[in-house]
């Protein structure tokens, strides 16, 4: 051969795998095996060198002066034969089959035998299964077996999903110390202190005799000064547990003083006046009717931390009278009117994408709808009412993103377009709207368990094109059109008492206005004031019962879709 060729190390990608396959075949045929592991009277032939190479437990057993060093049989205690079989398969194949059924046996066994790969696989599997109903149990399980990363992941999950977590049995069964640790954490993500207070009361009521004495100790970690005066007087003052405890009353009086004597607030600063660290939520505004008197496709995002607006990719079809919701880090844009016809089509943007992503189509609704109401409950999207170009609808349908399918549900009692749809305490409320003849003040609610609609107390004012949102256990209805005037008035519905109260009006009349809650405040977005479309945004703080203006959007619009979601 001509020339000088430099030596080169060549590595094949199949060598290690080939050796493992060969050793596994030898194990299964009991060839060259020099030890037998005995578990629950079942024998597992194996090779010491393979076990020692994979497990520090076996390495110590076979290389130290332990009694098992030279024995042909080794009894393994503390695990089942079926688990031993899974672990040996991993040792010889690098593959482990983790399931919901076996993980609670597999992880402790992997810890016992010091099989790091199996332990890691089990932890990753459990992290993928985290849910509000199981995260507290997984956290304890991880702590027991010193799985630090899994323990931290479960802890963060429980903080992020606190309002859902406290609805499940695992929370109710916590010890007092565990409840204290959770509720005093700055990182639990709640829009207000209401779910924290209600979680404490729920925990105490579960075992009243044993837990009633713990209430003052727990209540000191509830940041009651950050609750609204209305909630303090309507809910906390009427709670029998509070009224019977002098220590609890002192904490309530502190909260009242915080509101009644604002000049003393600087002297009252402490753990109970420090807000929880909320997730960085952002506001999305999609489509609508622009200043050029036509539907638009513009999407803007508002970040309350920076108080800045930015543009996201445009939707694929220009739409006004559009509804928008967020679900599992995805934004859905539903129905609307493109200037020619009402739409049944739905677009989706995956907000977890590395880049800004692209909009893509999902299954269309069964009915074409403009000015429909939309909301989410659980893992589903609900859409009701709307106008198809010829008639207003009473129908409601539900979208399941897991199967990309819409299904029809029970009809409302009244056909409505321009109505608001919102969920409170697991019930869907539809508010106001226009039936083709009259602007409505009627309100009906849908129970997903029974599939039936029922009327509740009507609003004080007839409204179509109002914005609706849930904040601190009250449904707020902002602006709209009453048939004569474009409204700046706002009213709030107390779902506990089935009653309405008027709250401070916005500074600007707004019809076809969007409304959503962000970081414990109510945002009224854009709309039409009777003369022109708006780009301005008002922000309502329920604690001080007043509005403030935030940075305006770059685009004037009404009839837009509005939603909030956690920043990626």
From Swiss-Prot:
- Compartment(s) where it occurs, according to its Swiss-Prot or TrEMBL record: Cytoplasmic vesicle, COPII-coated vesicle
Segments passing through the bilayer: none
Q: Where is the BTB domain?
A: 33-100
Q: Which InterPro entries match?
A: BACK, BTB-kelch_protein, BTB/POZ_dom, Gal_Oxase/kelch_b-propeller, Kelch-typ_b-propeller, Kelch_1, SKP1/BTB/POZ_sf
The pathway that the record names for this protein is: Protein modification; protein ubiquitination
Source organism per UniProt: Bos taurus
What's in the keyword line of the UniProt record? Cytoplasmic vesicle, ER-Golgi transport, Kelch repeat, Repeat, Transport, Ubl conjugation, Ubl conjugation pathway, Wnt signaling pathway
Sample GO molecular function, one term: ubiquitin-like ligase-substrate adaptor activity
| Pfam families from the UniProt entry | BACK (PF07707), BTB (PF00651), Kelch_1 (PF01344)
What kind of modification does the protein receive after translation? Answer: Ubiquitinated by the SCF(FBXL17) complex, leading to its degradation by the proteasome: ubiquitination by the SCF(FBXL17) complex takes place when aberrant BTB domain dimers are formed.
Q: Name one GO biological process term.
A: COPII vesicle coating
Query: GO cellular component terms?
Result: COPII vesicle coat; COPII-coated ER to Golgi transport vesicle; Cul3-RING ubiquitin ligase complex; cytoplasm
**Presence of the UniProt keyword Protease in the record:** no
Per-repeat ranges for Kelch: 282-329, 331-379, 380-426, 427-473, 474-520, 522-567
Q: What is known of its domains?
A: The BTB domain is required for interaction with CUL3.
This chain belongs to the protein called Kelch-like protein 12
The record's section on CDD domains has:
BACK_KLHL12, BTB_POZ_KLHL12_C3IP1_DKIR
